[in-house]
Amino acid sequence: MPASSVRLPLRLLTLAGLLALAGAAALARGAPQGGPPSPQGGPAPTAAPARGPTLFVLVGDGSAGFVFQLGGLGALNDTRIRGHLLGRYLVSYQVVPPPVSAWYFVQRPRERPRLSGPPSGAELVAFDAPGVRRTYTTAAVWPAEVAVLADAEARCPAAVFNVTLGEAFLGLRVALRSFLPLEVIISAERMRMIAPPALGAGLEPPGPPAGRFHVYTLGFLSDGAMHQTMRDVAAYVHESDDYLAQLSAAHAAALAAVVQPGPYYFYRAAVRLGVAAFVFSEAARRDRRASAPALLRVESDARLLSRLLMRAAGCPAGFAGLFDGRAERVPVAPADQLRAAWTFGEDPAPRLDLARATVAEAYRRSVRGKPFDQQALFFAVALLLRAGGPGDARETLLRTTAMCTAERAAAAAELTRAALSPAAAWNEPFSLLDVLSPCAVSLRRDLGGDATLANLGAAARLALAPAGAPGAAAATDEGAEEEEEDPVARAAPEIPAEALLALPLRGGASFVFTRRRPDCGPAYTLGGVDIANPLVLALVSNDSAACDYTDRMPESQHLPATDNPSVCVYCDCVFVRYSSAGTILETVLIESKDMEEQLMAGANSTIPSFNPTLHGGDVKALMLFPNGTVVDLLSFTSTRLAPVSPAYVVASVVGAAITVGILYALFKMLCSFSSEGYSRLINARS
């Protein structure tokens, strides 16, 4: 048979042609017939590294198939066979661990608590299975027909991450450039492996005993860590049928993959994410409906976590989408508008006002020590940094930097350690965004002594781009290795790398705190600070022609208090507290008249940062003005009482009136009793 004929599509090859090919292969030791047919289309499976002297190749058309067992690697030199070995119908059987006794099984997994309830309310959307079926192909398992619900892939030269969701089916492939691939299949039906004749027909791929689903893990047992990883991921789907518990575990696994780069963390996080999506799709498919907020949550988390994982592997890629546009058609609640805009890459212009209001409200609550929505803040910052003007971006970073206090950074570090603990109970939902926001999207770097938070911050800033934006989910061979621009650095390019903390001003300059004097800009050396940790405050800008190299000392002053209720004298100034140990304690942007009055109230202030009685004697204060002036703040010339609300005045008046009434009633009772008693006494004597 001519060599060119073997390159024809298999659907054109007849049964006689295949038999002729088998007879022409002198090295063939047998051609057992039967078995499932060859896949018709789909991506070519990647051949794994050869590990033995025997090759198995599957060829066939829609009606018949054959497995040829070739005697050795020398068969590759046969041009009549090479066309099939290098073609799309090659099936490599090198992923099955020899011997069979090396297959691994897991015990019953630890069940996780349920965090979400059944879908209810008016925000339900239909979730029906599609009528189109597709052939799912793999390297070691016979092809399966699957009704596909979702299909997503992130790919670059450094890594590939593919997820296929179907009716009671999950196919997941993960491969890294520097490590062996891993494949996980979850199916309600028993799968059959393409096995050597010696192992017999109908052999299941390796995996644990079947529970609600059959779980198969295919990969190379390269070392003990890989063996343990394959055992662990096989148990994920049976831990919980609650999508929110699985998503929480996926966020924790992604956190581990970002802060502890390595193939095993990457594999665990990828499988966690795939299993979370599978559990959600199965519940929605069975109910034929899904909660719109839940569908949006799964879609946005899949895009966010896939991007963070691929960034950890060295790729700027992430999932472009998961549920084939289903999520884009769901009604969006007002609280989820920023999440939806980020997820689908919508035109951000209609959402910019909402983003500004979200950042402002989070800042107001943060200054007063109240909790705020950290996830909404992340999406608001993402929109403002990417689509807002230069003023929006700089003002946003000024606020997030002020919100990033030492206490909040410590809380994020503690939350990270708890999430990374193997004993994490997941009694409540966990999201990576609760760790990332606001410190990871701020200009505060002096709290990054923990490498965990530093790695998270770098990953978070590169994940700020809208997930649906062009180029956010794909990478070419030429551009995959290029670093994506950091939107935080783009908003304030004048800030030097050694800055501990930066406060951007509207005019293109920034106040920066460093340990040594910057190359350009007027610098203030702060006195009374430990010489081992000196603090230098400088005003830097991109205008090199106006560079000022003067060294100064901040002037100590008693600033005048203002009595004008309609003019905010100190608005847009930044109040800073630092300690003699060289630590920046907090920064506060004065943005309103109310905050100005609280600042001048001194010990009567209800804002903790302004109240001097809450800080020790080694703590000093600075006032930074928008024009670049720096003042060592001693006090205000007069102490103003904190403003009293009208409700308090009304309550005080009512309380005083009630008190007077009670006293009057008591007085009348006493007088009446005395008068009546004397009258009786006089009458008795008479």
UniProtKB/Swiss-Prot annotation:
It comes from the Viruses. Residues 1-24 form the signal peptide. Residues 157-217 are annotated as: Interaction with gL. The keyword Glycoprotein applies. InterPro entries: Herpes_gH, Herpes_glycoH_C, Herpes_glycoH_C_sf. One of its GO terms (cellular component) is membrane. GO terms for biological process: fusion of virus membrane with host plasma membrane; symbiont entry into host cell. Residues 668-686 are intravirion. N-glycosylated, O-glycosylated, and sialylated. Residues 25-646 are virion surface. Keywords: Fusion of virus membrane with host cell membrane, Fusion of virus membrane with host membrane, Glycoprotein, Host cell membrane, Host endosome, Host membrane, Membrane, Sialic acid, Signal, Transmembrane, Transmembrane helix, Viral envelope protein, Viral penetration into host cytoplasm, Virion, Virus entry into host cell. Pfam families: Herpes_glycoH_C. Gene3D superfamilies: 1.20.58.1340, 3.30.500.50, Herpesvirus glycoprotein H, C-terminal domain. Glycans are attached at N77, N162, N542, N604, N627. Its main location: virion. It is a single-pass type I membrane protein. The chain crosses the membrane at residues 647-667. The keyword NADP does not apply. It is found in: Virion membrane; Host cell membrane; Host endosome membrane. Interacts with glycoprotein L (gL); this interaction is necessary for the correct processing and cell surface expression of gH. The heterodimer gH/gL seems to interact with gB trimers during fusion. The heterodimer glycoprotein H-glycoprotein L is required for the fusion of viral and plasma membranes leading to virus entry into the host cell. Following initial binding to host receptor, membrane fusion is mediated by the fusion machinery composed of gB and the heterodimer gH/gL. May also be involved in the fusion between the virion envelope and the outer nuclear membrane during virion morphogenesis. Belongs to the herpesviridae glycoprotein H family. This is Envelope glycoprotein H. The gene is gH.
